[in-house]
Amino acid sequence: MSIRFIYGRAGSGKTYFCLEEIKHKLNDGANHPLILLVPEQFTFEAEKYLLDMIERDEKMRAQVLSFKTLANRVFVEVGGLARQHMKACGKSMVIYKVLEENKEKLKVYSKASRQQGFVKKISEAITEFKRFDVTPFQLIDASEKIEKLGLKEKLEDLALIYSSFEEVLHKNYIDEEDELDLLSKKLEKSLQFEGAEFWIDGFTGFTPKQYKVIEKLLKKASRVSVTLTLDPSIDSIDPTHLFYTTKKTEEKLIKICETNGISVEEPVNLNKGIPKRFEHNKELAFLEKNFFSHPYEIYNEETKNISIFKATNMYSEVEEVARDIARLIRDEHMRYSDIVVATKDLKRYYKLVKAIFSHYGIPHFIDLKINITNNPIIVYVISIFEIYLKNWSYESVFRYLKTGFTGIDKEEINLLENYVLANGIKGNKWKERWEYRIDYKTDSLLMEEREKQIINKVNEVRERVYLPLEKFYTRFSHSKNVKEACEVLYDFLVENKLPEKIEKFIEEFKNRGEFDTANQYAQIWDIVVDVLDQMVEVLGEEKISLEQFARLISIGFDEYQIASIPPALDEVLVTSVDRMKSHNSKVLYLLGANDGVFPASSFEEGIFSDEERNLLSSLDLELDRDTKAKVFEEQFLVYTALTSASEFLKISYPIADHEGRSLRPSIIISRLRRIFPKIKVSTNIVEMDTDEENLNRVTVPLPTFNEMIKSFKKWNITGKIHPIWLEVYKWYRTKDEWKKKLEDTLEGFVYDNQIKRIPPLKIKKLYGEEMEFSVSRLEKYAACPFAYFVQYGLKAKERKIYGFEPPDLGIFMHNVLNEIAKALEKEELTWQEIDKEWCNDAVDIIVEEMVDKIPGYILKSSSRYRYLANRLKRVLSKAVWIISEHMKRSSFVPLGHEVAFGENQKYPPIKIVLSNGEEIKLIGRIDRVDVLEKEGETYVRIIDYKSGDKTLDLSDVLYGLELQLLVYLDAILESAFEGKANLSPAGIFYFKIDDPIVRADKDISDEELYKEIMKRLRLEGFVLKSLDIIREMDKLIEGTSYVIPASINKDGTIGKNTKGLTEEQFEILRKFVKKKSKKLAEEMLQGDISILPYKKEKETACQYCPYSSICKFETNFKGNDYRRIESKEEKLWSIFEEEVKEDGSQVDGRTEGSDNNEG
């Protein structure tokens, strides 16, 4: 019985020495067991090395074991497997059960027990206690010695949780940590390792339980050899030293030997000369010797085997690695298996490496286990419970449906989703048949056949979603315990053919070459069943609610991770520096060498803070290292990484993260640059157009093709290109498989997103043959022809979301005001005769009736919307009262409300004859027309209600953006209504429907408040510049009017603040608007669909346009620019007058004729 230490710095050949010794022992005929004991994650690699060195028939005598496989061997021999092994999933479930049962007794963790991730935190704490041989009794004992209340109560809580967990666990099970306890006991009875020889390799340190097992092995074995990464020539080692941990490991093993009378042999020191790994590479040998030396030497020669790459971001960093790997394979004749790519943060790099390496055709294995919680199969199972717990919320239902496992196809899901979103369906509404209207013809009260068909289809899909789930919830509610609940869920999954659907997906993935995804799906069903089995085993007879079940199954799934397909013979290994253990890699790419990342500068403290750990340590309660010690141990990780390759070390770091935030280089970079002043540092921050740089970008066909296109784009802008890309182009042109892609891509250089015209015959089919247009449609065309085409030609619609949006608000308010006008007529009242009380009562009744008569109407769907309905009542009451006040001060009287002009309406449409002889009709609906009879003349004013701020700007009229009021005026003036021939314009106005908030620094009187409200809600637009008409519109005017945008000076003249037009100006604008309408209609019907949005100061047509993703409008793109709107009034009038003068057309009745001289 003896122990022997094998010392050696990194690369000195410690593993090789062990394997060589085993080989020689076998050759010498050794008949006792020869065991290489390594960490669990390195067993596969160690077995491979061993097999390469020995004959296969000798494998039985020489074996590679980990502590886990060693335990299994002993248990098979002497027993110990009577109790079942509890998996991490079952362990978490027991902890959840313990927390639930003891939540009233817990002091610190009574509320935290239900927090996300808390079960995992407690699980890690219990694991730590067991690994370091800490019992619940020791926790209680420590708590009694501590005065600090927070830590005292924390220890008491943890002791209670831990002891309760152990009680449940040890009834029928053991967990992974118990195995080592059991192993150390059972080793005494084991005979298979009597006289065996052990080589323990690859460990930096051991847990207290592993030390106990080693102690037993030392008593059984003839010799135990332990490799230590250590330099025995270093005398004093403090906690900050690189080899501190391994030195402490040696001391503990020596102490065990002294206690048990086991001899310590003369150590083997491999630290002689150049380390074996670097015997042909003096740069890496120099690095190993000096990187952590104080003082260090400087390497003054050219550095060829170590390099640094400074990348703009993570993507370009990984792409540079991919390019360099392609070069090594092509030019240096390396094998992929010679290369390792490592990083401290593999989760952050995983997707990038996977995508870019696949793009470059680099075979690779990513040594990372992936959480399964986002896998569609798991999402499907979890969503079954979420739907119930979240009351059939939109998110939970469609998360479930979009997994692809419900048997409902995508088209049906889209139909259902649009309907649910448009109508805000959730909760009990899923139980009922749906009859909510679909917005085809909103003015039709009768449901059309097409609408009925869609609603029937929606309800058929609804039943296929609702009925199976409702049946499941009913059956689940009758289950008496966890076992029965698991059976109900399993039956539901099988009845809905989940295993068969998974198999179908696996086949599809394999056919597409997505073997990694196929491998993941293949494991998931077994995991689902395993979690259910664990629940039955651990909590089978426990009563459980659906909410608890959902939480438990989620906790179970959280414990599972899926590994990728095991590596092939020739693949690049992509791994984390924490798991890196490759003795035969020639090249290491070390990614993400950023400050604070590698080496890490901080760690999470866990259940105990560093201060608490140190306090417990002073009470002889030894736990894992504190974060400070872990930071020092990062040095050893850096050392291991930097010395793992035998030929090339390539370190890289990005200067910015994916959000553009700057990142600093790691201390590793600065230290390398000091030790190797001539080290090559390359970057892609500024692309160099050198022969070498361009040649490096030529790698494998697909990425090289993309690089060529990038060069062509620059050529297109700068007129310069490196000759190499012309040669590359010739290569692709000669390859049949690349010809089509090359042609299609080059066509993109002359791509223009502008589609100028569509043939008139096609455009008519798209817009409709009736040639009838509302004025608002012309205005939309003027704002941007392409947006108009998408909306009215392609009939594109935004998905309707259940809500009360500005358009809904506007329609609702208009309808209420129209109903008010009807109520006045019915009660034979005028606007002048009503008071505030009548306004409030009438609005209240009308709003309630409108809300009640529409099934599922949004304004009664929730307390929030009922509050909005009440607010609307206040706003509309104020609007009705203000209109009444306007009327009381005015001589004008309403001619009509909601006055329609068009075919079969009271007033005919405005007909415009186009240049080609075709006729279009302008139609519309005027909110209110007021008239005044005066001295044989009838004056007309047009009023349009608006729910938001709206001004009438003549520049908008010039560009066709504001035609409505003038066309409405023209419709009435040209109608010769009721035989009246002498019709004149009095004004065109917008009226804002609002209930303004008046803020004042001091108390104000009712009169002042009234005036302020009237001022804010006066009409906005243009009035006839006539003193008589202004006084008829506001009979009480003194100075500035509270009704219209006008003022009268003290001398009785019209004030300069009046927004007025003369009769001649009204006539000019009417003629201009007709001409503009004709021009817009002609452009529209000739198929002009140019992408030409307007811009007026900061406002553009694109601001709220839903079609920007279709047109791709960008001002820096060829042919893309705004139509800019001038707003100087003096200029505008000269343009209006010029346009009207050029137009020699005559107005005949209501028809606008054509003229060949029109510009």
From Swiss-Prot:
Pfam family, one: PDDEXK_1
GO annotation, biological process: double-strand break repair via homologous recombination
Keywords attached to this entry: 4Fe-4S, ATP-binding, DNA damage, DNA repair, DNA-binding, Exonuclease, Helicase, Hydrolase, Iron, Iron-sulfur, Metal-binding, Nuclease, Nucleotide-binding
SUPFAM superfamilies referenced in this protein's UniProt entry, alphabetically: P-loop containing nucleoside triphosphate hydrolases
Cofactor note: Binds 1 [4Fe-4S] cluster.
Subunit structure: Heterodimer of AddA and AddB.
Miscellaneous comment: Despite having conserved helicase domains, this subunit does not have helicase activity.
Name recorded for this polypeptide: ATP-dependent helicase/deoxyribonuclease subunit B
Species for this entry: Caldanaerobacter subterraneus subsp. tengcongensis (strain DSM 15242 / JCM 11007 / NBRC 100824 / MB4) (Thermoanaerobacter tengcongensis)
